[in-house]
């Protein structure tokens, strides 16, 4: 799994395409802001859909195969997307994002099935560390490529790197499960996903809470910079706030996951969601440098507490034959704010700017309280393997590499 995380870091470094997508569409491609926004929104829907449904491919065909296929499709499209006419972008961009979402859910599923229960918090923390470190390096590298060559080369570089990630993953990930449990020839007798979820109401409460809090959490990328600008703060202040978030997470998330590994997961998650709400509550009195820093510190510590723990909790409660679909549900919930936060937050900020931060604080607090209440609900017990092989879900063959 460490080798997979190395590949995730490399792939994250070059995943800068969609950071500069809006600039490329409104600049070299000559689209209006409205057209660029529509394309970006459609791409975001594709990403969320890929996260929500990618686990099904992994459960049926194998998580390794899902990762390789998703990376191959996404990389191939990105290599040629700069050459496509505008009309074709309405199909190519959401398809590339959908495939990227499948890769994201497959990465999580591979960590879930490759790390023993009890160690998954640390495993997912390592994965998040690799991803966050790559995203820290990627944007300035992308800016250099765009300045030295052109924005079109960003897509080529991203596409080639994604294809190389697929080749690398094919070499380092075994094509069979190292640990296998007896299972029938097919998973026809396995309970349906709905039945598995009904048997785990605490997981359902958690997923709903994550959708709510992600809508709140991602306001930092949409309405927060507008709010700061309206109160006289320039882009440098916002940039430093985001840097605080990234730096603290890189430094503290891994040791925190290790130190808190024996703490009750729902208590940790609930506390993290409450911290997210507390952060936005700091903005209610008004905008100042102190309140902005308080917001970001509270958001960051809330993220450290809930994101890794929630991912591991869902993995620990998933039945083996549906691990991919459980990870897909969490992955989709955890990124849903990327589509929901900008339009909903922007509309509320335009109509009633004084209500945005109080409502964000209340929504996150209610999500946190719901998770804390869910501790009294049955959360299910992960079942024996009744589907694909435990590690990758791929047929046995000689280990590559």
What are these model-derived regions, one by one?
Residues 1-44, 202-241:
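Helix-loop boundary and gating motifs at the non-cytosolic
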Residues 44-48, 52, 135-136, 246-254, ...:
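Residue-level signature of mid-helix packing/kink "hotspots" within the transmembrane helices
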Residues 65-79, 159, 267-281:
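Structural signature of the two symmetry-related core transmembrane helices
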Residues 50-62, 252-265:
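Helix-to-loop junctions at the C-terminal end of transmembrane segments
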Residues 82-93, 284-295:
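Helix-loop junctions at membrane interfaces in 12-TM secondary transporters
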Residues 1, 174-206:
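Juxtamembrane intracellular "pre-TM" segments in multi-pass secondary transporters
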Residues 94-131:
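Cytoplasmic helix-loop-helix junction between adjacent transmembrane helices
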Residues 49-85:
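Conserved MFS/SLC helix-loop-helix module at the cytosolic interface between two early adjacent transmembrane helices
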